[in-house]
A protein has these predicted regions:
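Long C-terminal interaction/binding lobes of large macromolecular proteins
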Residues: 1-285
Length: 285
């Protein structure tokens, strides 16, 4: 069989396939991506396509939402330059999802909120372009100074962030065990102990994995096993400082609380807007 015969036949409909709707700059500037996980742009801007029907269905699949798989598949579909979204730095996730929503539904997002004063259901429009610009203006701080050490950190990957979200569910399971009146006290203690150990180990491993290098008065330490051992054996204040720095860096670029006024009673209140994909992509402006 000739090479011409085995080549994939070009689709005459390809000229009507999706085209990029917008271009987005990533807050990380393309840093912190492992080799092969990002097709780096020379301009720093990446094409963003609107979601397909399949992409929208992904955000309606509970199991895929819970595991993070839906987010991974949609980012791969709509921002193909990000070839392995599991390894993308967490500081790029919100920017990517906002850009995808803009490309799919437009620059404004309609949200609803009940007034805490009169219970009136209000509707507001959020300017996502303004939001995206504010995210891109933010810079990640890669060093934590704990004299005489300097801890060099990287942001969570999306995989690690998903594991952190699952950790929250594990917390809930622990509380459910404690409040389960049908279980004996011995069973409660045993299951609580196992869950707590699992949760603690996951937390420590994720934080240790975000430490790329430690600068000491005697030089730099980059060996990951040695860094893991240090994190596991460091004083609590050292661990808490590193953990808080990494977490704060992520929270600093999350969608800010909106200060709004009720359309009925005119009183003002704070309205949180989340990046929970199940509602972020369900509400169209």
């Amino acid at each position: 069989m000739s090479d011409n015969n085995v080549q994939k036949k070009s689709n005459p409909l390809s000229q009507w396939f999706r085209q990029p709707k917008i271009f987005v700059k990533l807050p990380s500037s393309g840093n912190y991506y492992p080799a092969g996980s990002l097709d780096k742009s020379t301009t720093g801007e990446y094409p963003v396509y609107a979601m397909t029907a399949k992409d929208e269905l992904m955000f309606k699949t509970p199991d895929a939402l819970l595991s993070g798989q839906s987010t991974v598949e949609v980012i791969k579909s709509c921002i193909p330059a990000i070839q392995d979204p599991w390894t993308m730095p967490s500081l790029d996730i919100d920017a990517a999802l906002i850009a995808i929503r803009i490309a799919t539904y437009g620059e404004n997002m309609g949200v609803e909120a009940n007034c805490p004063h009169c219970e009136h259901l209000n509707e507001y429009d959020i300017d996502l372009v303004k939001w995206l610009d504010s995210i891109n203006a933010w810079k990640f701080v890669p060093e934590v100074e704990i004299p005489p050490l300097i801890i060099h950190v990287r942001p969570y990957t999306y995989k690690e962030l998903s594991q952190t979200s699952l950790k929250t569910l594990e917390h809930q399971r622990i509380f459910n065990v404690i409040n389960n009146e049908e279980m004996s006290d011995e069973d409660k203690v045993e299951r609580f102990g196992k869950s707590f150990i699992k949760l603690t180990e996951l937390t420590v491993d994720i934080i240790a994995g975000c430490v790329a290098k430690i600068t000491t008065p005697d030089g730099d330490v980059t060996d990951q096993e040695q860094i893991q051992e240090f994190i596991r054996n460091s004083p609590r204040d050292v661990f808490d400082t590193v953990s808080k720095h990494i977490t704060d860096m992520k929270e600093n670029i999350e969608l800010p609380i909106q200060h709004v006024a009720c359309n009925e009673c005119l009183k003002e209140f704070d309205m949180p807007v989340t990046m929970d994909q199940s509602n972020f992509f369900a509400v169209r402006s």
